[in-house]
Design a protein with these regions (language model features):
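Short, hinge-like loop/turn segments at secondary-structure boundaries
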Residues: 13-17, 140-144
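Structural signature of FAD isoalloxazine-binding scaffolds in flavoprotein oxidoreductases
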Residues: 7-12
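A short helix-breaking turn/cap at a secondary-structure junction
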Residues: 19-112, 130, 153-161
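Short helix-loop capping/hinge segments that flank enzyme active sites or metal/cofactor-binding pockets
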Residues: 78-93, 142-185
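General small-molecule cofactor/ligand-binding pocket signal
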Residues: 122-127
């Protein structure tokens, strides 16, 4: 999950998707993080409990990792059973690009906010002003470069050049765009 590959499908299917913090789930020996750390490994599960169990069995440092999670004993399953502390939750109900938000989506967000308030959490409206174009431009460089490196590695495994038929259209676009950039970009 770098841009929602776990969270988005889960949300569309009534499942649970979590993107753990960077360094929490090891990628495996001899493999660097995807997309310069934006991409994180985990799973889509039927419940928070199932995700907690999988975090318990898969989290932790690995030799050679450049990013280490906080050290200490963590029991995610036990943590899922404890009531959370009172939270201050930012409610951002506008579209990132200023596009209209469907009324059903607005109502789902409002309903969730009311539920969180009923559980004792504080809800505060938020509307951060973000340099969206700059953010997505930088992300495009990072994801494209990561894709380029991954496909060069794949070409070595295959013993031939990677072709458009080997990948999904969005990945081919990332790959083609990255080939136009220099390291200075």
């Amino acid at each position: 999950d770098g841009g929602g590959s776990i969270r988005i499908p889960a949300s569309h299917c009534g499942l649970f998707g979590l993107k753990p913090s960077r360094g929490r789930i090891p990628f495996g020996p001899g493999k660097l993080e995807g997309w310069m750390g934006l991409s994180i490994q985990h799973v889509i599960t039927r419940s928070v409990r199932d995700s907690a169990v999988l975090l318990d069995v898969s989290h932790g440092p690995e030799p050679g990792s450049r990013v280490l999670p906080p050290v200490g004993d963590v029991d995610y399953l036990a943590g899922h059973r404890r009531p959370p502390p009172k939270l201050r939750i930012a409610l951002w109900d506008t579209h990132l690009f200023g596009l209209p938000v469907h009324a059903d989506c607005r109502e789902a967000v409002a309903k969730t906010a009311r539920l969180c308030e009923s559980l004792g959490h504080t809800i505060e409206p938020a509307a951060p002003k973000l340099p969206v174009q700059d953010m997505f431009g930088a992300m495009g460089v990072m994801t494209g470069t990561g894709t380029l490196v991954a496909f060069h590695d794949r070409a070595k495994q295959l013993g031939r050049d990677v072709t458009e038929a080997d990948m999904e259209p969005i990945n081919w676009r990332h790959y083609q765009e990255a080939r136009k950039r220099s390291a200075e970009d």
